[in-house]
Amino acid sequence: MIDFSLFYNSTDHFSIIPAVMLALFGCAILLFDFLIFPDPRQRKFLLIFVVLAEAFTGFGLFRQQAWLAAQNAPELSGFGGSVTVDGFAIFFNWIFLVAAVVVAIVSYKYLEISGEHHGEYYSLILFAQCGMYFLATGTDLITLFIGLELMALCFYVMVGFLRTERRSNEAALKYLLLGAFSSGFLVYGFSVMYGIAGSTKLSDIAAAIASRPPWDPMVFLALSTTSVGLLFKVSAVPFHMWAPDAYEGAPTTVTAYLSVASKAASIAFLLRIFLGPLASARAVWEPLLAFIAIITLTIGNLAAINQTNIKRLLAYSSISHAGYMLLGLVAGNDTGIKGIAVYVMVYTFMNLGAFLVIIAMRRASIIGEDLDDLAGLVHKSPGYAFLMLIFLLSLAGIPPTAGFLGKYYIFLALIQTGHTGLAIVATLYVAVAIYYYFKIVRSMFIREEMEKTPMLATSFGLRCALALTGIATLAIGIYPEPFLRLAQTSLFR
């Protein structure tokens, strides 16, 4: 008889309950869409499955959090250490859950206007989130790669979801080809790590690399090839080329999900690798990462200046935000890692909010993605105009919005670790960002409306999502203490 207890114990299923819930409900949506709801008018009920999936996922995360607190344990390991649930993983998974819920509830009306199918769309949201779960909890190269590819494959399909639009198809193809190319580098880097340690466990790899000099050729090869794959996922320069096309070509709801959840998952993945296996090689990667962060800030901010398509402008803005997060990793102290966590949290709300306003602009004949589409918005829909103003001020890092808090901790960490020059340069780019964000503000508040078209009636879900993101963006900036305590739990140990 085979003793399965050698391979499976009672904590294994507990460590992946949220992922199991997401996968089961994702499959259930596909089955119900095909067998139970063939009539397009019935497909609105599929959204209920997404809400239930997120409710069960949230309950699973809460139970894991409660177990760690009750046991006074720093982490919960499953499957022989391949999955580790700790404060870091739970924090990021709450971010994924919020992003998925917001995107799902605003997608119903958007899909109706676009004339696209609902079933596979909602399933892809859940399957992508399932992949993100393993990116945040994975402590084994195989687990991390499976999570990454599950997430990436879902986004390849979602970016090209508008099958009748050429730009959507082109964006998906470019994203797929470049994504596959970067995954090749990542796998090669993983294979070098396995060759160094003889194990796929991150802890074993960290010990093996620590026993070698930082400039060891094999360590440098593993670092350089792995970094290509990781930096592509966070859209850092020079691996950012896919982001503007993918953001512009994808459905706006997908762009919102991609810009927030995918970036948060990729940041979690990057932290797992750089603060785990590659931590002892900091002398090598810190100056390289600092250079890449500054170049990312430069290209992202300067390229955004001349954009007239709002989604493309926000794509370059997203690239620059990746640069700020990388600077937190360059600092590398507790303040820096806490700063990254705070930045990811506030970026989720303010960037989602900005894209939600774009979604609200969608009318029967106007997509609502160009600056001209927002002209005179304050006269037609002052609520949307002022919400967009709040989100843009936050993206620029202006107090008392949440965005200021994220940048403050990044800059503080840089100064604490002696990187004052980097902090000064990063601060200068805030001024550049204010300039191109003001282009949108100018269009909404100063320019006259170019075409007298009535606003499309927005759904209740969209109004709730806008209220949530707007309140969160202001609340985190005005009363940050509870949110800072939440970010403190995410410190990587």
Swiss-Prot record:
Main location: membrane
Pfam families according to UniProt: Proton_antipo_M
Membrane topology: Multi-pass membrane protein
InterPro entries found in the cross-reference section: NADH-Q_OxRdtase_suN/2, ND/Mrp_TM
Entry annotated with the keyword Magnesium: no
Any one Gene Ontology molecular-function term assigned to this protein's record: NADH:ubiquinone reductase (non-electrogenic) activity
CC per GO annotation: plasma membrane
Keyword GTP-binding: no
Catalytic reactions on record: a quinone + NADH + 5 H(+)(in) = a quinol + NAD(+) + 4 H(+)(out)
GO biological process annotation, one example: ATP synthesis coupled electron transport
EC number: 7.1.1.-
Localization, UniProt: Cell inner membrane
Swiss-Prot/TrEMBL keywords: Cell inner membrane, Cell membrane, Membrane, NAD, Quinone, Translocase, Transmembrane, Transmembrane helix, Transport, Ubiquinone
Record function comment: NDH-1 shuttles electrons from NADH, via FMN and iron-sulfur (Fe-S) centers, to quinones in the respiratory chain. The immediate electron acceptor for the enzyme in this species is believed to be ubiquinone. Couples the redox reaction to proton translocation (for every two electrons transferred, four hydrogen ions are translocated across the cytoplasmic membrane), and thus conserves the redox energy in a proton gradient.
HAMAP family: NDH1_NuoN_1
Family: Belongs to the complex I subunit 2 family.
Assembly and interaction partners: NDH-1 is composed of 14 different subunits. Subunits NuoA, H, J, K, L, M, N constitute the membrane sector of the complex.
PANTHER family: NADH DEHYDROGENASE (PTHR22773)
Protein's recorded name: NADH-quinone oxidoreductase subunit N 2
Taxon lineage: Bacteria, Pseudomonadati, Acidobacteriota, Terriglobia, Bryobacterales
Gene behind the chain: nuoN2
